[in-house]
């Protein structure tokens, strides 16, 4: 039996917060700040956004490893934060996250239309998130009331290693019955999510304006003067350089055009691993 390269995409694997729901990715960010505050440790929104895309325990561990935050923790507790301390913060983070998730559950403008167009092109819709399953259960239910249902969902604690490891993306490949990772496109607003797709051998699309990197509401984004938006886009594109996305677009609304371009490249024999 011979290997035949895929001729078209078979699936889009979409992130959740900052990609399909929660423009600006506010739900997780604010809760990190609140969870640390309950332990008397100040963390800014900007600091909290840094590791976004990772599983939430890993995110907290990464924050605790930042020297400035570690020193604030030491000032309160007289020691650097251990893994047990990270777990204590995580266990406070979780109920706060579940309680507040509905406040940031709106579907991103243009997402439903874009996803419908992808389905019309024959793509299945997989999804994964840095949220654990207990949070994703609520996120998925809220999204369904707003008209979005993915064909498959993988939470960060349903695989051995979350992002930037490729396990969640590959779990979607298996569940959706996709026969070649090169027939998948991973879409995300964070560098760990893009690395996840790259490591899984997929096409990757980074979102520059709807998620964590820009960190604005939809209304704030639309109100940005053109020159300021261009500066922000340049900054964000530089931030993504290390993860090497194949495409950078502002929001998921532009995704159908990217899919058509990828299909044309596949038809020419191009593969994601070679670009």
UniProtKB/Swiss-Prot annotation:
One of its GO terms (molecular function) is magnesium ion binding. Keywords: Hydrolase, Magnesium, Metal-binding, Schiff base. InterPro entries: HAD-like_hydrolase_sf, HAD-like_sf, HAD-SF_hydro_IA, HAD_sf, PGP-like_dom2, Phosphonoacetald_hydro. The keyword Endoplasmic reticulum does not apply. The keyword Heme does not apply. Involved in phosphonate degradation. NCBIfam families: HAD-SF-IA-v3, phosphonatase. Homodimer. This is Phosphonoacetaldehyde hydrolase.
């Amino acid at each position: 039996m011979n290997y035949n390269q895929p001729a078209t995409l078979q699936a889009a694997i979409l992130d959740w917060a900052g990609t399909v729901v929660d423009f600006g990715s506010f739900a997780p960010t604010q809760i990190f700040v609140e969870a640390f505050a309950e332990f008397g440790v100040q963390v800014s929104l900007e600091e909290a956004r840094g590791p976004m895309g990772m599983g939430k325990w890993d995110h907290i561990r990464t924050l605790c490893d930042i020297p400035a935050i570690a020193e604030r923790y030491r000032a309160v507790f007289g020691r650097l934060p251990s893994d047990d301390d990270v777990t204590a913060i995580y266990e406070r983070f979780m109920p706060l996250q579940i309680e507040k998730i509905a406040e940031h559950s709106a579907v991103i403008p243009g997402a439903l239309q874009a996803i419908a167009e992808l389905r019309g092109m024959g793509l299945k819709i997989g999804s994964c998130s840095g949220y654990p399953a207990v949070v994703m259960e609520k996120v998925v239910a809220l999204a369904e009331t707003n008209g979005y249902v993915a064909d498959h969902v993988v939470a960060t604690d349903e695989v051995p290693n979350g992002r930037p490891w490729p396990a969640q993306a590959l779990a979607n490949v298996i569940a959706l019955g996709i026969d070649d990772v090169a027939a998948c496109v991973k879409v995300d607003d964070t560098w760990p999510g893009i690395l996840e797709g790259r490591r899984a051998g997929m096409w990757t699309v980074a979102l520059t304006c709807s998620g964590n990197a820009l960190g604005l509401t939809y209304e704030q984004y639309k109100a940005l003067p053109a020159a300021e938006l261009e500066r922000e886009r340049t900054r964000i594109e530089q931030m993504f350089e290390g993860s090497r996305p194949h495409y950078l677009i502002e929001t998921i609304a532009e995704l159908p055009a990217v899919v058509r371009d990828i299909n044309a490249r596949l038809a020419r024999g191009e593969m994601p691993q070679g670009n």
